[in-house]
């Protein structure tokens, strides 16, 4: 089977990318520490045997480290250089500024530290006020990246899906589009209540207790055609590069150490 055939077989699949469940669990734990939530009981199941009453809230150690790291990395604007093409350099710098990337990078770095990375979706419309649009997407919630099972650097298909409020319809809707190197696929929006009541949507996000649109059988393709770019316009940026699909968050390996600091104090 060719890579194009493998990618085509993934269109509108109800299967999830390998490792996504693991990533969601890791990100949920990291977000709990960052939001200074009370500790979920399962955090202690492997070593906390004594009963000390109500579980304590997370101290702001992890949050402070991540905030400082993000500001250190992207507190100063990046400079884009295209030595062999000054016109392209001027255009990219203008698009970078109009997409407010200088301010957004700090927030993206914080999100990547918690989720293990971030995805950037690029769109081009020469008639738009900002022809080159850069959209940042959560690897946990808003994008599904399917890779060649034999090469974790070869992306076969990217699915972008997220909820939004439709003011005309007066309800929350779900948006979906998919990309392979050969095809661009768009779907009709789906109302949130359709996902909630569908028997095919029984699976829920373990971390967020909400319906998973990946399992919904009612998605209908509204348009499907050739990819005008010849490549998938999604960049997967890992927070820390590792030899797997998703990389790692800044403090994933240290949260259990922080537990041992928090509990004696609280």
Tell where the protein language model's regions lie, with residue ranges.
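Extended, helix-rich architectural segments
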Residues: 1-155, 163-165
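Generic hydrophobic, helix-prone segments enriched in Leu/Val/Ile
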Residues: 69, 108, 112-113, 176-177, ...
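Extended, non-transmembrane interaction/recognition domains
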Residues: 182, 189-201, 205-216
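Extended, charged amphipathic alpha-helical segments
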Residues: 209-266
């Amino acid at each position: 089977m060719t890579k194009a055939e493998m990618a085509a077989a993934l269109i509108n699949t109800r299967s999830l990318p390998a490792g996504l469940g693991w990533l969601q669990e890791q990100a949920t734990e990291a977000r709990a520490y960052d939001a200074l939530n009370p500790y979920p009981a399962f955090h202690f199941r492997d070593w906390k045997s004594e009963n000390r009453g109500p579980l304590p809230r997370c101290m702001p150690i992890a949050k402070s480290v991540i905030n400082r790291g993000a500001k250190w990395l992207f507190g100063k604007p990046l400079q884009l250089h295209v030595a062999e093409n000054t016109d392209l350099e001027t255009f990219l710098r203008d698009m970078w500024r109009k997409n407010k990337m200088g301010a957004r990078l700090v927030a993206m770095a914080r999100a990547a530290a918690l989720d293990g990375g971030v995805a950037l979706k690029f769109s081009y419309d020469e008639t738009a006020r900002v022809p080159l649009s850069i959209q940042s997407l959560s690897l946990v919630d808003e994008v599904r990246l399917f890779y060649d099972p034999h090469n974790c650097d070869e992306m076969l298909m990217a699915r972008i899906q997220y909820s939004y409020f439709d003011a005309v319809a007066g309800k929350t809707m779900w948006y979906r589009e998919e990309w392979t190197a050969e095809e661009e696929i768009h779907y009709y929006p789906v109302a949130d209540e359709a996902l909630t009541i569908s028997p095919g949507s029984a699976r829920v996000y373990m971390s967020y207790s909400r319906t998973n649109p990946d399992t919904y059988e009612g998605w209908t393709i509204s348009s499907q055609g050739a990819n005008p770019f010849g490549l998938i316009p999604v960049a997967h940026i890992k927070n820390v590069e590792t030899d797997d699909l998703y990389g790692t968050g800044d403090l994933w390996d240290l949260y259990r150490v922080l537990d041992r600091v928090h509990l004696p104090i609280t």
